[in-house]
């Protein structure tokens, strides 16, 4: 396990009674009299530990391998490494990051079915053996570059009910799977298991059942060909926040019986998964500052009974956009909703508004329409559930820098992380400590932020 002390974490350790919300307000207050009101994140590492406890309870047979691509922030990876999770890496760079933090190669799966030969060789030279494939060409590459690899066959699934579909790009059909297994046997390459991914934002948990059933078929094919497969990877697609139609426990409530049916506990099959957004989405809150404002007058309709306020809309420009943190709107099908840092007056008027990023691109729009009280340059907007597929894909287009991330952790969360590193960590401690962890940036009832009335839903995770 990775033993490290507070000094190794670039993290603010919260005093008793303080939460991530307090740090966010503190950072805003610190720059209130300055012109440098840059966008920033507050990330609650304790929220990630709470998610891990929740995972252990909901999917006790499934070992999580965190999808590094979702958020490769070093503090996130290090926190999860301390809990003993594995890691789903998609490239040489991600493998380097994870191994630089002391994670052994046995806790890494190179889960990219289409790999560059030089990166396959890098994995071989650094002890990473588990890797996925879905084609004969990939088999040939691995046979030459990493003959001792432990291969996992990625199969296609019905991801028609997912927001982000992956089977259009990855996965072998059942018919092709048999041919690939036979070819792997000819090449003397060891196939140790099967993987699949039902897609992100899956709205039908029965998709998992069908995929697990298909995986069982491929296991049986493997046995007929002569492989003794022992690994099932059920992929990702687990929600990372509560503002979704299908809750995490609703999904796991369907997965567990399917696993027991097709891969019972006495089958000798190890089961892993590749959660990404599940762990990090709700841990991050983004604060952006209004840097410009434009009033747009609507064309007069001639109606006498129209409220004068309805004749204008507001355009707000903030210092992060779709080329930065909000790339999730373009690439992850996210719908974001702002929170107001200042509580509006009860009788304050609301206006039709739109929110735009800082770049020169006319497509840099964050929210097409929402109802907000009139705001001003220098005011702050907050966006919750911004930990997944945001900072990892942010660019510096137009010279706009990525927001700073301020990590926080409570005392109980820190103690829990130390307990995770104890090999004798008892299951009963897990539930006991879950309730002691503080609420993160999903504000407690007495401190709730005022939520703007937007046409779009909260971020889709």
Swiss-Prot record:
Subunit structure and binding partners: Homodimer. Only the dimer is catalytically active, as the active sites are constructed of residues from both monomers. Does not form a heterodimer with AZIN2.
First-tier enzyme category under EC: lyase
Pfam families: Orn_Arg_deC_N, Orn_DAP_Arg_deC
Keyword Lyase: yes
Activity regulation info: Inhibited by S-nitrosylation. Inhibited by antizymes (AZs) OAZ1, OAZ2 and OAZ3 in response to polyamine levels. AZs inhibit the assembly of the functional homodimer by binding to ODC monomers. Additionally, OAZ1 targets ODC monomers for ubiquitin-independent proteolytic destruction by the 26S proteasome. Inhibited by 1-amino-oxy-3-aminopropane (APA, an isosteric analog of putrescine). Irreversibly inhibited by alpha-difluoromethylornithine (DFMO).
Site (Stacks against the aromatic ring of pyridoxal phosphate and stabilizes reaction intermediates): 197
InterPro entries for the chain: Ala_racemase/Decarboxylase_C (IPR009006), De-COase2_C (IPR022643), De-COase2_CS (IPR022657), De-COase2_N (IPR022644), De-COase2_pyr-phos_BS (IPR022653), Orn/DAP/Arg_de-COase (IPR000183), Orn_de-COase (IPR002433), PLP-binding_barrel (IPR029066)
Active-site residues, Swiss-Prot/TrEMBL: 360
Protein name listed in UniProt: Ornithine decarboxylase
Pathway in which the depicted protein is active: Amine and polyamine biosynthesis; putrescine biosynthesis via L-ornithine pathway; putrescine from L-ornithine: step 1/1
Recorded superkingdom: Eukaryota
Role according to the record: Catalyzes the first and rate-limiting step of polyamine biosynthesis that converts ornithine into putrescine, which is the precursor for the polyamines, spermidine and spermine. Polyamines are essential for cell proliferation and are implicated in cellular processes, ranging from DNA replication to apoptosis.
Enzyme Commission designation: 4.1.1.17
Post-translational modifications: S-Nitrosylation inhibits the enzyme. S-Nitrosylated in vitro on 4 cysteine residues.
Record-level GO BP terms: cell population proliferation; kidney development; polyamine metabolic process; positive regulation of cell population proliferation; putrescine biosynthetic process from arginine, via ornithine; regulation of protein catabolic process; response to virus
N6-(pyridoxal phosphate)lysine sites (modified residues): 69
Keyword Nucleus attributed: no
Organism, scientific name: Homo sapiens (Human)
